[in-house]
Swiss-Prot record:
Keywords: Membrane, Mitochondrion, Mitochondrion inner membrane, Transit peptide. Its main location: mitochondrion. Probable mitochondrial mRNA stabilization factor. It is found in: Mitochondrion inner membrane. Pfam families: mRNA_stabil, RsfS. This is ATPase synthesis protein 25, mitochondrial. It is a peripheral membrane protein. One of its GO terms (biological process) is mitochondrial gene expression. Residues 194-203 have a biased composition (Basic residues). One of its GO terms (cellular component) is mitochondrial inner membrane.
Length: 628
């Protein structure tokens, strides 16, 4: 009997569900009446009552149009909303990144990706566009020279660093059509190969590596990413590595570097416990090193480095240890954070010490290779003079050290010619420096002869061909050094000396501009050194044609000083007999103290040589100045 009632209830419930009307309210009342009638049919069977109640609940859930309560949402729909809520309220969005003024859009896109998608923290941006202030370089690193924006960020691990670079590179390719490059930790496969090689060496190393492996998941990692876009560089470091390197001090403005100084606030015990996890023979040494570790600034002061360090590197240089010396120099440069110009000046000072100490046994090819290894491929225009000055000083020291192995021709090629072919202008000071080296080498060599002058003259002509501006002949210092390259003594000098003097006189007459006093003095000095008195008096008379009353611009005091120094009895007698000194009275030349002293000395020398000078002396020294 109970089974029959239960089956009839199921059939009626199915019929009610199948033929229920469209009205949700009517269906709801119909179902309630049906359930109430079934409850009164049997009050003794709890099984039927529970079944009917269960079926009534199912009927209520099937009614989609009911107004009493809404149906619950599936769990997967609630997860979508939950993810959006997390994205909108993530802690990474709370980072405040300060952008430099006039930042490019590419920088903003990169920072937003690092911050929101890759989960990097502590993001700092340093603006390196203003590289110089008052001709002084603001940043000590070479990377700052080619970078406009330096980004520093912190990752959670080495894996995180590597993943960030991969994702950043993908974005660069897709959005900016640029492929970034990275320097820093190698990938995990290369790291495993490295560990296998190290493990083969010694048992001690193998055991220490087994207990303290340094795989690519280590916590000390640094990736430097060149975005190849708007000169943006991104540094991705782990927390410990960032604290150790303290790159902020390198790229911060000078006025802000102090706040990035490293503060070793952690105790030595805490540090030693952190790094001595392995129970091996090196742990004790590691603890001692950590206890003695001090906080140093990452900025090096090149001026504090003694040239003796580089001198020691260059002193024992030979063909066999060249590669070792090059490595030592690179290590010194890296450890001291030396720039290219600092290293070049460092080597120039060391070469000067070699020259002063007469270290003749020097491997010159190796010495040159060491200098050229530090010479930049692209010389910055802003401070190019410093680079060429360092190069000139270095090769000058090489020539002074051993002229037989490093000749003047080598200096000309490595300094002047290379500067010209590098796209830089050969200036007057470059030629003046070269001519001074030429003239000093001629005078210092006791065996110098006319053929040495010919060789020197060939180098002079080659150097002059590097200059296109003819206005250089107006520079008295340049003419002085040029004439000195043509004179050894009164018996050994080049005929080109007279050609230059004639050209200067001709150019002065053509332009109707008188030669300046310094230029006249230089020519007189050169002619007195070679003791060509006829040429000297010819030149002096040409100058006298342009002199007139109270307008005699010739340097009489200097002229007499050189005559007194280089002249002889014949010269003194010729000057008295030709009446050259009478032009002092005729043109009313002012008798300055210097001129009076030189006249007195001239008359004294002439009297000692038996030349009558009393009449001329009285006429000149006792002459009264004419009224104005």
């Amino acid at each position: 009997m109970l089974r029959l009632k239960f089956n009839s209830t199921r059939r009626l419930t199915a019929l009610a569900t199948k033929h229920k009307p469209s009205s949700g309210i009517y269906s709801f009342h119909l179902q309630n009446k049906f359930i109430q009638s079934q409850r009164f049919q049997s009050t003794t069977n709890d099984f039927n009552t529970n079944a009917i109640n269960s079926d009534s609940k199912n009927l209520e859930e099937l009614d989609v149009n009911k107004t009493v309560s809404s149906a619950p949402q599936p769990w997967y729909l609630t997860m979508v909303k939950r993810e959006k809520l997390v994205e909108n309220n993530t802690i990474l969005e709370d980072q405040v990144v300060k952008y430099p003024e006039n930042s490019p859009g590419s920088l903003i896109s990169i920072i937003e990706m690092l911050k929101t998608e890759l989960g990097l923290t502590d993001i700092l941006i340093f603006d390196l566009r203003e590289k110089e202030t008052n001709n002084e370089y603001n940043y000590p690193t070479a990377a700052a020279k080619i970078s406009d924006f330096m980004v520093l960020s912190t990752a959670q691990s080495t894996k995180h660093c590597e993943k960030c670079f991969v994702e950043l590179n993908k974005m660069m390719k897709q959005k900016f059509n640029s492929i970034a490059s990275v320097e820093g930790n190698i990938n995990s496969n290369d790291e495993r190969k490295k560990q296998k090689r190290l493990a083969r060496k010694r048992n001690l190393e193998r055991s220490s590596l087994a207990k303290n492996p340094t795989t690519s998941t280590s916590r000390d990692s640094w990736y430097l990413v060149d975005c190849h876009l708007d000169n943006i560089f991104v540094n991705i470091l782990t927390k410990n590595r960032r604290k150790e390197l303290n790159l902020e001090e390198l790229y911060a403005p000078k006025e802000e570097r102090e706040k990035y100084r490293y503060d070793n606030s952690r105790s030595d015990l805490e540090l030693s416990d952190e790094y001595s996890s392995g129970n091996n023979i090196l742990s004790g040494l590691r603890k001692i090193a950590l206890q003695r570790r001090r906080a140093y600034s990452t900025l090096a002061n090149p001026s504090q480095l003694s040239p003796d360090i580089a001198f020691d590197i260059l002193k024992g240089l030979n063909k066999d240890n060249l590669h070792i010396k090059l490595k030592e120099l690179d290590q010194l440069k890296s450890a001291s954070s030396l720039t290219d110009i600092d290293t070049l000046n460092f080597l120039s000072s060391a070469a000067k010490q070699l020259s002063n100490k007469q270290e003749k046994k020097v491997y010159f090819k190796g010495l040159q290779k060491m200098f050229e290894s530090q010479w930049p491929l692209i010389i910055p225009r802003t401070n190019s003079d410093e680079f060429w000055s360092a190069r000139s000083n270095f090769y000058k020291s090489c020539f002074e050290l051993n002229p037989q192995q490093f000749s003047l021709k080598d200096y000309f090629i490595n300094c002047l010619l290379i500067k010209r072919v590098s796209g830089f202008k050969v200036e007057e000071k470059d030629l003046i420096n070269f001519f001074n080296i030429l003239s000093s080498s001629l005078l210092s060599n006791e065996k110098s002869n006319y053929w040495n002058l010919i060789k020197s003259n060939n180098l002079v002509v080659s150097a002059l061909n590097l200059i296109d501006d003819e206005r250089i002949i107006k520079n008295s210092q340049f003419i002085d050094t040029l004439l000195n390259t043509m004179i050894i003594d009164e018996n050994k000098h080049s005929r080109a000396l007279y050609e230059i003097v004639d050209y200067l006189v001709y150019n002065s007459e053509r332009s109707n501009k008188a030669l300046e006093i310094p230029m006249i003095t230089i020519i007189i000095n050169a002619l007195c050194r070679v003791q060509n008195w006829s040429k000297l008096w010819q030149f002096w008379d040409i100058l006298g044609k342009n002199a007139n009353y109270r307008n005699d611009f010739r340097p009489w005091a200097e002229y007499l000083r050189l005559i007194n120094k280089n002249g002889n009895e014949t010269v003194h007698r010729k000057i008295i007999e030709d009446g050259q000194l009478l032009w002092i009275v005729r043109n009313d030349v002012p008798l300055t103290k210097e001129l009076t002293d030189q006249l007195s000395k001239f008359f004294s020398l002439s009297n000692d040589e038996g030349i009558e000078t009393d009449t001329v002396k009285e006429l000149i020294l006792n002459a009264k100045p004419s009224p104005v």
